[in-house]
Amino acid sequence: MRIVVAHNRYREAQPSGENTIVDSEIAQLTAAGVEVLPFIRSSDEIPSMSKAAKALLPISPIWAPRAQHDLSRLLTEHRPDALHLHNPYPLLSPWVVRTAHRHGVPVVQTVHNYRQVCSSGIYFRDGVICQDCKGRALGVPAIKHRCYRDSAAQSALMATTLAVHRGTWRSVDRYIALTSAIADHLREYGIPDERIVVKPNSVPDPGQPAPLGDGFLYMARLSPEKGVDLLLDAWRRHPVGALGTLRVAGDGELRPLVEAAAAERPDVVYLGQLDRAGVRAAVEASAVVIAASMWHDVLPTVIIEALASGRPVLGTALGGIPYLVGADAPHEPAGTGPAEVASAVAGGGSGSGGSAMPAGIGLGEAGWVVAPEPAALAAALPVAQAGAPLLAPTARARYERTFHPDVVTKQLINIYANLPQTPRNP
């Protein structure tokens, strides 16, 4: 099997989980015996481009002629079984779908964000969820609010690109939705069920989990959409020390809020930006990982890392978070799903304290979800603290069954193998 993996890498100065996932997926496919032909561009190339190449940048999101020429040559020479597209912006363009189809090559796309509709890709503006461009032929609100790179001109270009390529996106042969929430987004966009497959990302297996640590870990970009201010508000509603330690890892514009909270309360510890070893140590030191996103977060990798280490997750009920903790679907193996765990907790299972689940807290196989509100999160913190020992084994089991690299890679190869022989036309 021969697969072209196409991706426009985000700038290295802007840490990107998507870049990491693409690199990992290429390595896993190669290890599984798939011949991978990377077709990679990087936004870091832009400053060193020639004047002529820079002159074409404004049209690159729509067409990107150099990329189409190079891709045509690659497809002609190697005749791959499929093209797997990740991010096309700005140097590849969605036009690569048309180029692949012109060569008779079917296209798979992994959907990492909401940029079929939303120019910023995250459905979030000015501190709140925004879906003003849904259902519009042209995303005029995105232009008005400078949603793409805080530029009216660049927002106009992106909104135009999305309008021009609506037919292109609807011609993709198979969409990989990272969670059930992304699958719903694609259905709303007009993609039929038979062209959507839910396949999450994976993280490497860290091995059998260490014993549960103490308290909570929040690990994310310190920006408004990731909800660190929501978490700190909820945390302050409990006496100092009542919930153990809150460890916060990451960096971003809201770092001063975290540093102030750490100076104010001895039960808040700011860890800064961590490397891989630091991430593992922080996860192992904690009992519960928190994902407090205020937007429809597609697939926070920190949740999969938590499950791999046998740590249940307390998250907001937005985007892919309910799917990740198993709170959005029927249970799988008997005795391990949300219904069984809920029954065990309500009946006084280990770590439950013997009390019923409070209203407003959704219980999943591997964690809890609540509304993105301070009072709701504050109410769930002691529930998660008490219930962590019960959910820790099922958190690890969910990782092994759903997010382990071997499972996910096999699923991806099956997606390639079941593509239609004749690609669609836009």
Residue ranges and their predicted role:
Residues 75, 273-274, 282-286:
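Short alpha-helical donor nucleotide-sugar binding micro-motif in glycosyltransferases
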Residues 116, 131, 135-207:
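Donor nucleotide-sugar binding/catalytic pocket of nucleotide-sugar-dependent glycosyltransferases
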Residues 256-278:
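Nucleotide-activated donor-binding/catalytic signature segment of Leloir-type glycosyltransferases, i.e.
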Residues 280, 303-308, 319-326:
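Short alpha-helical segment that forms part of, or immediately flanks, the ligand-binding pocket
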Residues 312-315:
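Short hydrophobic beta-strand element within catalytic cores of glycosyltransferases
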Residues 389-402, 411:
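A short, well-ordered alpha-helix in the C-terminal region of glycosyltransferases
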